[in-house]
From Swiss-Prot:
Residues 1-26 form the signal peptide. One of its GO terms (cellular component) is high-density lipoprotein particle. This is Apolipoprotein C-I, acidic form. It comes from Pongo abelii (Sumatran orangutan). It comes from the Eukaryota. The keyword Protein transport does not apply. It holds the Pfam family ApoC-I. Apolipoprotein C-I is present in acidic (APOC1A) and basic (APOC1B) forms in P.paniscus, P.abelii and P.troglodytes and perhaps also in baboons and macaques. The two genes for ApoC-I arose through a duplication process that occurred after the divergence of New World monkeys from the human lineage. In human, the acidic form has become a pseudogene sometime between the divergence of bonobos and chimpanzees from the human lineage and the appearance of the Denisovans. Pseudogenization resulted when the codon for the penultimate amino acid in the signal sequence was changed to a stop codon.
Length: 83
C-alpha cells in the first residue's frame, strides 16, 4: 500500500523538477542592485537643488528677514520702554 501511494507522489515531484524554473524564477538580474537607489539619489539631489535655487531667487527670504527684524525691533523697543 505504501509503494502504491508513494509512486504517484514521486511522479508528480519528478515532473515538477524536470519542468524547470517558472519564468518569474528565471536567472536573477545580474545588474547592480544599487542602480535603483543611485537613480533615486540623483533624482532627490536634482529636486533639492531646484528647490533651493527657487527659494534663493524668490523674494520670500528677504520679506521674511525684514518681517522678523521689524518684529524683533518692536519687541526690543517695547521692553526698553517698560524697563
Amino acid at each position: 500500500m505504501r509503494l502504491f501511494l508513494s509512486l504517484p507522489v514521486l511522479v508528480v515531484v519528478l515532473s515538477m523538477v524536470l519542468e524547470g524554473p517558472a519564468p518569474a524564477q528565471g536567472a536573477p538580474d545580474v545588474s547592480n542592485p544599487f542602480d535603483g537607489l543611485e537613480e533615486l539619489g540623483k533624482t532627490l539631489e536634482d529636486n533639492t537643488r531646484e528647490f533651493i535655487n527657487r527659494i534663493t531667487q524668490s523674494e520670500l527670504p528677504a520679506k521674511m528677514w525684514d518681517w522678523f527684524s521689524e518684529t524683533f525691533r518692536r519687541v526690543k523697543e517695547k521692553l526698553k520702554i517698560d524697563s
